[in-house]
Every structure is written in C-alpha cells, then in structure tokens.
Regions:
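Conserved Rossmann-fold cofactor-binding substructure of NAD(P)-dependent oxidoreductases
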Residues: 42-65
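NAD(P)-cofactor binding segment of oxidoreductase domains
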Residues: 59-100, 105, 132-135
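Conserved N-terminal Rossmann-fold NAD(P)-binding element of oxidoreductases
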Residues: 3-8
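Conserved beta-loop-beta element that borders a ligand/cofactor-binding pocket
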Residues: 135-152
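Aromatic pocket-lining residues of Rossmann-like dinucleotide-binding sites
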Residues: 20
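Active-site "gating" loop of Rossmann-like NAD(P)-dependent oxidoreductase/epimerase domains
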Residues: 103-125
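N-terminal Rossmann-fold NAD(P) dinucleotide-binding loop
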Residues: 13-14
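N-terminal Rossmann-fold cofactor-binding loop
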Residues: 29-35, 51-52
Length: 152
C-alpha cells in the first residue's frame, strides 16, 4: 500500500487525502487543529498536530515508508515552515514531492491573462514568499508546483 504525507489537511489537503484514500492510499498528515477533522477522515489515518514553530515529534518515524509528500502550508513571514523545521529530515527523501502554491506569484496584470509559463513577478509580500518557498521545494525535493487560484 502506498503512503502519502500531506502537510496541511485543510481545504485542498483534505480533499486530496480523501481522493487518495478512496484509491487505497494510506494517509498521514498534519493540521493545526486535529479536532476539526472529526468525521472527515478515514479509518487508519495518522493525523499529527503541526504549528509553524514546533517540529513534528519523531520525524524519522513519521516520514518512514512515505511515497509522496505534499505541502499545502502557506509561507509564513517570508519562509516555508515545513522546510524550516524538517528540511534536514527530508534530505534523503526519494519519493514524489508536491507543493501547492498560489497565483499570487504572478505579476499584477489586470488587463491581461497569466499562463503557467508567465514569468513570476509577485506584487505582494505573500507572493514573494511563495516564490521563495516554491524554489526551496523544487531545489531540495524536486517538487512539482501547483498554483491554486482564488483560495490561497
């Protein structure tokens, strides 16, 4: 059975986890408030509390046998909390990695359309932080980046 670890079981992360679980995946993931997931998670899911300044307990065990790691967690104060706390723990990860970013990385183009190949040129601090986080995820884990519009 394949295992997915999802940092941030919120709107996007939870939907993704539910879809993977229906296909037979084992789910591990984090949330700031585990009680909010009551009734929304499957049997056998491993849910861990995660806040931006507290590393997960026993990360070696938590990341063992994980095939996929995905982060939906925002960059905070210009930095990525997942890689800040667990970058070293994930150095030897050889599975697939994904980072859910936002379209705020694109320039402000009110009279035009941005495409996936539009060069990043964020107009906001949040967008600038996302660009840095994307780069870190790509450089360290070879992550694929998904830029969600309108929800981040």
């Amino acid at each position: 059975m394949k295992t997915a670890f999802i940092f941030g079981l919120g709107y996007v992360g939870l939907s993704l986890a539910q879809a993977l679980a229906k296909k037979g995946w084992q789910i591990r993931g984090t949330t700031r408030t585990p009680s909010k997931l009551k009734g929304k998670i499957g049997i056998g899911w491993e849910i861990l509390p995660f806040v931006a300044d507290v590393p997960l307990a026993n990360p070696k065990k938590v990341f063992a046998d994980v095939d996929v790691i995905i982060s939906t967690i925002n960059a905070i104060d210009g930095s990525d909390p997942v890689l800040d706390l667990h970058g070293k723990d994930l150095e030897n990860f050889s599975g697939w990695a994904g980072y859910v970013s936002a379209t705020s990385v694109y320039p402000d183009m009110p009279d035009s359309i941005c495409y996936e190949d539009t060069p990043v040129a964020p107009a906001t601090n949040r967008g600038k932080a996302r660009v840095l986080a994307e780069s870190r995820w790509q450089n360290q884990l070879g992550a694929e980046v998904f830029r969600a519009a309108g929800i981040y």
